[in-house]
Amino acid sequence: SPFLSKFNPLVKEQRSGADLFYFDRGDKIGDAADVFANEVRLLIDQHGNSNNRLAVDKIMLHGLRSLEALNFIVVDGEEVTEKSRSIKGADEIKAMRCASYACEKAIFEMEQVTRSEVCNANLSENDIWSVLHAENIKRGGEWIETRLLTSGPRTNPWFQECGPRIVQNNEIVAFDTDLVGSYGICVDISRTWWIGDQSPRPDMIYAMRHAHEHIMRNMELLKPGVHMSELTHNAHKLDEIYQVGKYSCLMHGVGLCDEWPLISYEDKFVEGAYDYHIEAGMVLCVEALVSPEKGDFSIKLEDQVLVTEDGFENLTKYPFDEALMGN
């Protein structure tokens, strides 16, 4: 609704959405699309010297056909928007710092509940995950895009959603926030905890240290001027036992959500797909999923990292689990 932005001096014009949904346009959706397309035409005539090239990132089919009927040449706008969002301005970086701080406070509350209640043998994965939701909303956040919190053997393979399973004493709990937080900024970080009164197994400690080394070594590669392919080819290598279950990428951009670019592992590298250089102001999430093949656990770590003029700054301050680090 236009009134939601009238208070904002940065917004010069307010317009309602095109609203090309069948459920509220019915069999006259084509007419509604024509009205929208004509509004776009008038806007382009006013500001664009009758330029008929139009970049659109997402569009309903009726809208596309109506624009083309007015002789617009519609091209893909997703590349334009992704690249324009990839370099953050000073205000965006401030907002991301605030969002990161709020997210980590929410994680802290989730960890406190987890560590205090698991011993009572009545805390489910859903119970734990609900704390992050509530604490995110409490701090001005918006929503969480996934349900990536699992415990014990459900951490391997990764990408199982949280459910009603009761977390047991002396088990791993791993999660990926994937949340849209304060100021509409995405905070996408991961941690793995050991919950229990005994020590984790040696193979778990080794995997945790290996995952920690993986993200720390890889973020050290980040600085302006580095070609994206260099990040792939110079990355820290996971042990062979973790190759099958490793994450889908080494790093990915982040801003309003997960964004361009994606830095792949060597076995997923596509020549020419990301023929660009890292620039100051980019923010990338550096990933590690250390998941032993046919194992009964996974370690998931992820930090959100800002590329600075002379290197990088890790925006993520949340500590790593002391027991799993072997301390």
Show the residue positions of the predicted features.
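Active-site neighborhoods and metal-handling regions in enzymes and metal-associated proteins
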Residues: 1-327
